[in-house]
């Protein structure tokens, strides 16, 4: 599937906040938004009034960029969220959180969602004992995600496992550091999703 291949630091500057797309670099003084907190481009430092539509569009773009999803796939997630019972915006975020690449990132087994996506594609993880290399795979309560035994010998995986052992995952994920595996305890509640997104604006945008 096609992916954005430009500078991810520009995306953070465009949205006006850290999206943590570059992993460890985002926590250092080298982070682009710390050095230049205005939008990229010739008129990036200019001030302009943003319309209601503009606010809604920016919120959708922000969500897409946080989770690293292209427009067509994001739209499909929204349509699926609409068909589910409950609040559409919360359903949307819940679907995005359940992506396997996001779960790996939340567990600390990827410094960024992009790295987590690459590790999933390279087949380093299993779900319920079977290797899964599809980043968009949606986990469900009761699923067990584990690092493959062969992958534990990789220097990068070893480093990530050490870091994950010191990290507290979201409450909907139960991580056993000594076994290098996690269990999906429940679907994530809205207050367990720390994505800085106003999902109601996305719903308003797609409802136009």
UniProtKB/Swiss-Prot annotation:
> Is Disulfide bond among the key words of this record?
no
UniProt xrefs under SUPFAM superfamilies: Alpha-L RNA-binding motif (SSF55174)
Which GO terms are recorded in the biological process aspect for this UniProt protein?
A: ribosomal small subunit biogenesis; translation
InterPro entries to which the protein is assigned, alphabetical = Ribosomal_uS4 (IPR022801), Ribosomal_uS4_bac-type (IPR005709), Ribosomal_uS4_CS (IPR018079), Ribosomal_uS4_N (IPR001912), S4_RNA-bd (IPR002942), S4_RNA-bd_sf (IPR036986)
Which residue intervals define the domain S4 RNA-binding in the entry?
Answer: 98-161
- Recorded GO CC terms: small ribosomal subunit
Disulphide-bridged cysteine pairs: none
Keyword check for Transmembrane: no
Q: Which Gene3D superfamilies match?
A: Ribosomal Protein S4 Delta 41, Chain A, domain 1, RNA-binding S4 domain
Q: Which UniProt keywords apply?
A: Ribonucleoprotein, Ribosomal protein, RNA-binding, rRNA-binding
> One GO molecular function term?
rRNA binding
Q: What does this protein do?
A: One of the primary rRNA binding proteins, it binds directly to 16S rRNA where it nucleates assembly of the body of the 30S subunit.
Family statement drawn from the similarity comment of this UniProt entry: Belongs to the universal ribosomal protein uS4 family.
Looking up NCBIfam families in the UniProt record yields: PRK05327.1, rpsD_bact
Q: How does it assemble?
A: Part of the 30S ribosomal subunit. Contacts protein S5. The interaction surface between S4 and S5 is involved in control of translational fidelity.
Name this protein carries in UniProt: Small ribosomal subunit protein uS4
Provenance organism = Pelotomaculum thermopropionicum (strain DSM 13744 / JCM 10971 / SI)
What gene codes for this chain?
A: rpsD
């Amino acid at each position: 599937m096609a992916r954005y291949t430009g500078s991810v630091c520009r995306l953070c500057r465009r949205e006006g906040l850290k999206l943590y797309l570059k992993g460890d670099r985002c926590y250092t003084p080298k982070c682009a938004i710390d050095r230049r907190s205005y939008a990229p481009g010739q008129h990036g430092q200019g001030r302009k009034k943003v319309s209601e539509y503009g606010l809604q569009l920016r919120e959708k773009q922000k969500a897409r960029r946080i989770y690293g999803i292209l427009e067509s796939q994001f739209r499909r997630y929204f349509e699926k969220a609409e068909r589910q019972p409950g609040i559409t915006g919360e359903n949307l975020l819940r679907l995005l959180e359940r992506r396997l690449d996001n779960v790996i990132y939340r567990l600390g087994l990827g410094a960024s969602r992009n790295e987590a996506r690459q590790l999933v594609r390279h087949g380093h993880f299993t779900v319920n004992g079977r290797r899964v290399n599809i980043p968009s795979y949606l986990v469900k309560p009761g699923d067990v995600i584990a690092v493959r035994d062969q992958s534990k010998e990789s220097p990068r995986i070893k480093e990530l496992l050490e870091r994950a052992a010191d990290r507290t995952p979201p409450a909907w994920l139960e991580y056993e550091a000594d076994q290098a595996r996690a269990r999906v305890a429940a679907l994530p509640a809205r207050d367990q999703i720390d994505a800085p997104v106003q999902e109601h604006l996305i719903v308003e945008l797609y409802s136009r």
